[in-house]
Amino acid sequence: MRFFTQSPFPLRTLTRRLTAFVCVGLLLLPGFTLAASVRIKDITDMEGVRSNQLIGYGLVVGLNGTGDRLTNTIFTRETLISMLNRLGVNIRDQETQLQTHDVAAVMVTADLPAFVHGGNRIDVTVSAAGDASSLTGGTLLVTPLMAADGEVYAVAQGSLATNAFSARGAAASITRNVPTSGHIANGGIVEREVPFDLSHRANLHLSLRNPDFTTASRIASIINRTFGPIAIVQDPRTVLLDLSNHDPVSTLSRIGDLLVTPDTPAKVVVDEASGTIIMGADVRISTVAVAQGNLTVQVTETPQVSQPGPFSGGQTAVVPRTNVKVDTGKTHHLAVVPGGTTLRELVSGLNALGVGPRDMISILQAIKADGALQAELEMR
């Protein structure tokens, strides 16, 4: 006698389906959340490893009549004359006849990444400094880029890509995006590098992008479990690494790939201008009663003409007619929000009251003032 029948699915397929079913069921349970683990290198920076900002001043040529008006932008005219003079073209005696509209003075900016070497290329951004209406189709002439110390670290040149257009006629014009700012991919060549020797560093600091004691402790804990006692938490932002007995490059590579679960503070960010509200998952409120309603006063002016009868000797006059209407909005009941309410429950409860984003901002401010909002409220 046989007690088993052959299943239409292989055992491995059934196992996978049961596992998926259990996982989906857990996700549907109230209050069940999955903490997201991230790599250490995605939430920290290494001390001393950073980019440096560069800036320069130059000329863009080849514009189709959309450049600076030389009579208004004196610096553009002087820069053009000086550049032509360096190239052996002397027009000082005829500078008043210089009437071109195909040149624009621009500011050039770029970021010099860490560990970059001479000859490497970087992206540059070009922005109009004068009254040019568009930089579309222009070419940036060779422009030195300096850092805050006044030294030249890169040189930029190339054709601009603006991702915009501008057209105008006798009575109308149209502009899409920002034609007075452009981008040159790989338009800068590094001439000087910032020295940074990582191979001989005995100590190194990891800097958290979002300072937090819990996250810093978790980072130090996972590093110490993997490499031994080499990590010490100095403050909520800094974890000190002792690499004296390790190869810094390979060790930092392995540390960066370690997974850690960052702790997020209970925080509510409100943008009053746009009505945007961002609330973290750990936001809680104590027991509080909420009632919300709107008051709208509408004043309508309807002027009427008063016409006197024939031969009455009266004069025609405009008589104002004012209608005032008060609307208190639909009636909302007083709702009691229990203590320990989560983000989902809070939003659902406020939506049940018919509360919009802007009204929700006022309610959150009132709850915070009452001391019932157990989170930081940041207004922007």
UniProtKB/Swiss-Prot annotation:
Assigned GO CC terms: bacterial-type flagellum basal body, distal rod, P ring; outer membrane-bounded periplasmic space
A Gene Ontology biological process term: bacterial-type flagellum-dependent cell motility
Subunit: The basal body constitutes a major portion of the flagellar organelle and consists of four rings (L,P,S, and M) mounted on a central rod.
Stored InterPro entries: Flag_FlgI (IPR001782)
Xref: PANTHER family: FLAGELLAR P-RING PERIPLASMIC PROTEIN FLGI, FLAGELLAR P-RING PROTEIN
GO terms of molecular function: structural molecule activity
Record keywords, A-Z: Bacterial flagellum, Periplasm, Signal
UniProt entry tagged with the keyword Signal: yes
Source organism of this protein record: Gluconobacter oxydans (strain 621H) (Gluconobacter suboxydans)
Listed name of the protein: Flagellar P-ring protein
Compartments, as annotated in UniProt: Periplasm; Bacterial flagellum basal body
Function, in words: Assembles around the rod to form the L-ring and probably protects the motor/basal body from shearing forces during rotation.
Family membership noted in the UniProt record: Belongs to the FlgI family.
